[in-house]
């Protein structure tokens, strides 16, 4: 469906409102599937999809859906392994670009991990999951929060199964995390050990007397700890026990026996010794991590396609959740043959709008006794809501053609080919503006098809007399072609004389309140020319005025009421 003039701006504002509510960028792509269309079957299909989706999507899922993001499996080159293959397999293996490849066994010695298809090292096939299973495991591990969120949205699904498999590799990740922080762990243990040894020395000193105490203090001041520990073997045993205990704690978390602390005081591990230990552990962990990843990835691979589908489905559910929020208290409009209307429609661009009921074309029994007309002239008070009503009509018609619910208690519409909306341009006047506006109206009226044309005060850019003649003829042509037209005009009486087939409605300012402010009922009265605002403004000035000013205003007011 084609949107012309200010109808495009209304659509952009509706889209902007929706997009601002969508926090996940990937979910915004679903909006593109709901561009306004003139295909009746497509509109019905969209309505059915949204009816089902909005009914089933749960508000409590939002917390989990907002945690969803893409899980990206990056391609990486591994320098810690080499793949030994037959001459025939070299080209295929090199194309994978995952690690160094050779067919010469003499080139494999310096690598921690030796993979092979010809009987050396770890037996593999030439495929990514065998050569670099970490490429699958690491991204999944790093995105456990996404998997956990998906498991809440789709219990028992692919994410759930992958999380169960990842638990088998959890211990290795913990070891690797400890390895990264090994320097800090050892330094902390050093401090802890030295503090405990100092405490033991102090306590032990209190048990000594006489010559033993003198010898102890002399050796301690001289730093002759070897003599001290040799002389006092019980103390030595206690300190060795503390060191062994500290090493066991580190060994337990690393899963490998470690002897790193010197049997001396103060305990201090040289940095080069820590680095040597880290290199040794890294080598062992890489092999362990590879083997466990290889085993785990075989269980995970069958679920990856389903996982991808779950992520896309989660974006779709989030999109539906946003639409559900946006369209709360909306209604799906009924598709009819000849009419556009709504009961208690609410303008989405106005805060706390007054609900309004209106129609053009057939009313389908919703407005008994009201004249049905394809051409409607809307008259009445300035600032009474006439332009807002045109805006509301365009909102409802655009949303309806998107397949969306609309802001009303009840609504119906004819599937259109085009919507034209000519909003009043308050700062544009003169011959140029008149010519441009007239050309725009002629473009709207020409051609065939189902059209809705919304016009806001065409007469404001030319003389009222000329405007009445031009509009009358244009509206006759629109009537002959079966177009729907709602035009805001102060020329209701003049136009009604020229085109009796049109219905004239009015928005009335009811009067003045106790503070002399205008009271406006934004619900149009059908078949009634709206009472103009100028009369009420004159009345307000007459009631406020004094002396001669009041007398003049009262004389003007009498002219209105003759």
From Swiss-Prot:
Cofactor(s) the protein requires to work: Co(2+); Mn(2+)
Q: Which InterPro entries does the record cross-reference, listed alphabetically? A: DNA-bd_MutS2_arc (IPR012401), DNA_mismatch_repair_MutS_C (IPR000432), MutS (IPR045076), P-loop_NTPase (IPR027417)
Q: How does activity depend on temperature?
A: Optimum temperature is 90 degrees Celsius for ATPase and DNA-binding activities.
Q: How is the cofactor bound?
A: Divalent metal cation. Highest activity with cobalt or manganese.
Instruction: Tell me the Gene Ontology biological-process terms attached to this UniProt entry.
Output: mismatch repair
Cite the binding residues for ATP.
Answer: 380-387
Instruction: Show the GO MF annotations.
Output: ATP binding; ATP-dependent DNA damage sensor activity; hydrolase activity; mismatched DNA binding
Does the keyword Ribonucleoprotein feature in the UniProt annotation?
no
**The UniProt record lists the keyword Nucleus:** no
Query: Which keywords does the record carry?
Result: ATP-binding, DNA-binding, Hydrolase, Nucleotide-binding
Record-stated family: Belongs to the DNA mismatch repair MutS family. Archaeal Muts2 subfamily.
Task: State the HAMAP family in the record.
Answer: MutS2_archaea (MF_00971)
Q: How does it assemble?
A: Multimer.
Give the protein's function: Has ATPase and non-specific DNA-binding activities. May be involved in recombination and/or recombinational repair. Not involved in mismatch repair.
Protein name according to UniProt: DNA-binding protein MutS2
Say which species the protein is native to: Pyrococcus furiosus (strain ATCC 43587 / DSM 3638 / JCM 8422 / Vc1)
Q: What is the lineage of its organism?
A: Archaea, Methanobacteriati, Methanobacteriota, Thermococci, Thermococcales
């Amino acid at each position: 469906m084609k949107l012309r003039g200010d109808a495009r701006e209304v659509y952009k504002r509706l889209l902007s409102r929706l997009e601002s509510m969508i926090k996940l960028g990937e979910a915004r792509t679903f909006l593109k599937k709901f561009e306004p269309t003139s295909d009746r079957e497509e509109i019905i299909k969209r309505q059915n999809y949204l009816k089902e989706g909005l009914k089933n999507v749960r508000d409590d899922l939002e917390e989990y859906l907002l945690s969803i993001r893409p899980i990206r499996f990056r391609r990486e080159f591994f320098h810690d392994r080499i793949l030994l293959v037959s001459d025939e397999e070299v080209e295929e293996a090199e194309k994978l670009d995952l690690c160094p490849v050779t067919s010469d066994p003499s080139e494999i010695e310096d690598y921690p991990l030796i993979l092979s298809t010809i009987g050396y090292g770890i037996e593999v096939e030439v495929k990514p999951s065998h050569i670099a299973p970490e490429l699958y495991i690491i991204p999944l591990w790093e995105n456990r929060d996404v998997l956990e969120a998906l498991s809440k949205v789709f219990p028992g699904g692919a994410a759930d199964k992958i999380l169960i498999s990842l638990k088998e590799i959890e211990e290795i990740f913990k070891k690797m995390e400890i390895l990264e922080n090994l320097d800090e762990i050892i330094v902390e243990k050093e401090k802890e050990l030295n503090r405990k040894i100092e405490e033991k020395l102090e306590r032990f000193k209190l048990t000594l007397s006489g010559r033993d105490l003198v010898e102890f203090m002399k050796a301690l001041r001289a730093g002759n700890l070897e003599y001290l520990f040799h002389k006092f073997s019980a103390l030595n045993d206690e300190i060795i026990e503390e060191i062994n205990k500290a090493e066991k704690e580190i060994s337990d978390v690393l899963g490998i026996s470690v002897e790193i602390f010197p049997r001396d005081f103060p305990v201090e591990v040289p940095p080069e010794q820590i680095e040597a230990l880290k290199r040794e552990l890294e080598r062992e962990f890489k092999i362990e991590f590879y083997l466990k990843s290889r085993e785990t990835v075989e269980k995970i691979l069958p679920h990856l396609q389903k996982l991808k589908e779950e992520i896309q489905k989660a974006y779709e559910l989030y999109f539906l959740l946003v639409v559900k929020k946006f369209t709360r208290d909306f209604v799906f409009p009924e598709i009819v043959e000849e009419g556009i209307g709504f009961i208690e429609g609410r303008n989405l661009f106005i805060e706390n709008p007054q609900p309004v009921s209106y129609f053009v074309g057939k009313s389908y029994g919703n407005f008994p006794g009201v004249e049905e007309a394809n051409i409607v002239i809307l008259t009445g008070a300035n600032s009474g809501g006439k332009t807002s009503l045109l805006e509301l009509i365009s909102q409802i018609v655009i949303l309806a053609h998107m397949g969306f619910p609309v802001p009303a208690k009840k609504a119906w519409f004819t599937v259109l080919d085009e919507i034209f909306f000519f909003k009043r341009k308050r700062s544009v006047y003169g011959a140029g503006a008149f010519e441009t506006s007239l050309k725009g109206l002629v473009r709207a009226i020409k051609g065939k098809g189902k059209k809705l044309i919304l016009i806001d005060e065409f007469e404001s850019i030319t003389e009222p007399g000329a405007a009445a003649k031009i509009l009358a003829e244009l509206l006759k042509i629109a009537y002959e072609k079966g177009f729907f037209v709602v035009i805001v005009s102060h020329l209701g009486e003049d136009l009604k004389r020229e085109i009796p087939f049109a219905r004239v409605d009015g928005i009335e300012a009811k009067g003045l309140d106790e503070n002399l402010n205008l009271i406006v009922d934004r619900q149009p009265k059908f078949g009634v020319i709206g009472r103009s605002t100028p009369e009420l403004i004159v009345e307000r000035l007459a009631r406020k005025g004094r002396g001669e000013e009041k007398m003049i205003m009262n004389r003007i007011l009498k002219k209105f009421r003759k």
